Amino acid sequence: MSTTENRGQFGSKLGFILSAAGSAVGLGNIWKFPGKACSRGEVHGRNLLAQSAAFLLVYIIMVALIGTTVMMAEFTVGRNAHKNALGSFRAISQKWGFAGGIGVLTGFIILCYYCQVGGWTMKYIYAYIAEAKMVYADPTAYFLGMLGANGFPLQGAVIFPLIFLFLTAFILSHGTAGIEKMSKVLMPLLFVLLIGLMIRSCTLPGADAGLKYMLNVDFSTINSNAILVALGQAFFSLSLGMGIMVTYASYLSDEDNLISNTGIVCVLDTLVALFAGFMIIPAVFATGIDPGMGGGFAFATLAGVFEAIPGGTLFGLLFYFLLFFAAVTSSTSIMEGTIAFLIEEKGLKRNHALLGTSVVVFIIGVFYTLSQVYMNIKGIWVSKNGIEYPIFGDFLEYLTDRLLLPLGALFSVICVGWVWSPEKSVEEATSHGRFKFSLAPVYKFMVKIVDPIAIGVIIIAGLVFGMSIS
């Protein structure tokens, strides 16, 4: 086992847990999870995807069975080698470094559009401070204007994403110490804002219908599609398949308890998703706003919700701060995977790696936003319907969500389960017997048999049926 000499290292268990939870808690927890929890059933006469409480239970089961075991596998790989994602898998077998390489590539591509959306959260913070009336006049038009409907989207594609990217790089310029300090500040603030907004939403007139929808279990609404969606959401929500958890665990000492750390991170991530559901769905019921869950939901749809509630401008401002905190804690972790790779595999200094990565991420990201409305930029995708030409932004999401993310995770669990062996993974998780792991037999079975099958199903659902796991 290599040492952590000359590498960053988390200074405390709390610092690692908050950093890993910050990575897992992203934009998808706050706006995509409530949308999927509200995707069948009926709100104001609108057919949705599954009765919410039943979906929540299925989601929690998927996190407990699939999410925790895949995360544990990634943690053990990273801590075993104390290297970047590619180097950690290569330490298991020279032939399997590509499993980590896929994760690094996936994270880099996601970072390109994640920093753009992070910039949008900053734009909306500014909007709610300086021009809330313009947002309320027509929330959809304001959102589309930010994307270029009224001319080149200087603020939406360049200025605010550039500020967000600079902030991400600045935090990472201080290494693991920067990540840890940021997480210790932003994660508690995120929970305070989330709980406060959840309480406000649940006390709105008419919110009781949303609460009933969230809490009334009807298993007859659960079908194979809902199970697949819950599985995909649980997988994506925990930042698996990007090499992030491998990289973060590589900054742990051999005395850290990976078993308890895995459980705590998964619980915190799930709590954020559940709290977000109780924050958004009751408000949707209370205001009668159409809960369309497309890409503009957090910006166009929820702006309409805030307009309709007392004190909406204040709560809207707090909500976009919440989104910003979630975005920046995730963007730093995603970028760190790339930076660690460039430092250790290519010999770059940290600041040089940050500069080069930021430039490329920014350029690609600009085209992501421009393709939404302003320019007709397309990619190419092959599906069961033949060759398609989605807009460039959708192409990037298809590439990561439907192919690279689950593919990287699949190779990761195959490597742990069949090349390295679950027994060695358990030995690493317990710090060579220092910690007790009573569920070790279950973990071994999951990582060797169940996890590869489940992830394979996600890949088939994405490539054949077009299901996006995020």
Q: How should each PLM-predicted stretch be described?
A:
Residues 102, 346-358, 397-455:
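C-terminal membrane-solvent junction of multi-pass transporters and transport-like membrane proteins
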Residues 15, 157-158, 268-274, 313-316, ...:
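Loop-to-transmembrane helix boundary motifs in multi-pass membrane proteins
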Residues 1-32, 70-75, 79-91, 97-98, ...:
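Membrane-interface "cap" regions at the ends of multi-pass membrane proteins
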Residues 13, 18-20, 58-94, 115, ...:
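Juxtamembrane transmembrane-helix boundary signature
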Residues 4-7, 35-50, 80-102, 115-177, ...:
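Inter-helical loop and helix-membrane interface segments of multi-pass membrane transporters/permeases
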Residues 2-3, 40-46, 118-151, 251-255, ...:
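Helix-loop-helix connectors at the membrane interface of multi-pass transporters/channels
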Residues 12-60, 249, 259-263, 267-268, ...:
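Transmembrane helix-boundary motif of multi-pass solute transporters/channels
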